[in-house]
Amino acid sequence: MVFLLCFFLVADVSYGINGDCELPKVVGPCRASHPRYYYNSSSKRCEKFNYGGCRGNANNFHTLEECEKVCGVRSRDSPKEN
């Protein structure tokens, strides 16, 4: 019984963040400049960046609120500019 409890606690911590949120920031090769947000796994915050418009990945959100909701960010610090 203790083993199962430990297993679920570890699983909860390990998988608490959506896997897409662990992807690196990808600006992409196109030349557009769309303001977007991505989850920075080092700072554990959603940060603003300019998306080029193509060949990005799933760690790319239209709003800070969407990024925080999907990636489980608890504190609402001001976003770090990149």
From Swiss-Prot:
Matching SUPFAM superfamilies: BPTI-like (SSF57362)
Please provide, in alphabetical order, the Gene Ontology terms of the cellular component aspect for this entry.
extracellular region; nematocyst
Cysteines engaged in disulfide bonds, as pairs: 21-71, 30-54, 46-67
Chief location of this protein within or outside the cell: secreted
- Looking at the UniProt record, the site noted as Reactive bond sits at 31-32
- Which protein are we looking at? U-actitoxin-Avd3p
GO terms of molecular function: potassium channel regulator activity; serine-type endopeptidase inhibitor activity; toxin activity
The compartments listed are: Secreted; Nematocyst
Q: Where is the BPTI/Kunitz inhibitor domain?
A: 21-71
Which InterPro entries does the entry link to? Kunitz_BPTI, Kunitz_BPTI_sf, Prtase_inh_Kunz-CS, TFPI/VKTCI-like
- Record-stated family: Belongs to the venom Kunitz-type family. Sea anemone type 2 potassium channel toxin subfamily.
Arranged from A to Z, the UniProt key words for this protein are:
Disulfide bond, Ion channel impairing toxin, Nematocyst, Potassium channel impairing toxin, Protease inhibitor, Secreted, Serine protease inhibitor, Signal, Toxin, Voltage-gated potassium channel impairing toxin
Q: Where is the secretion signal located?
A: 1-16
Q: Which CDD domains match?
A: Kunitz_actitoxin-like
Residues of the propeptide? 76-82
**Pfam families reported in the protein's UniProt record:** Kunitz_BPTI
> What is the recorded function of this protein according to its Swiss-Prot or TrEMBL entry?
Serine protease inhibitor that inhibits both tissue and plasma kallikreins. Has hemolytic activity. Inhibits voltage-gated potassium channels (Kv).
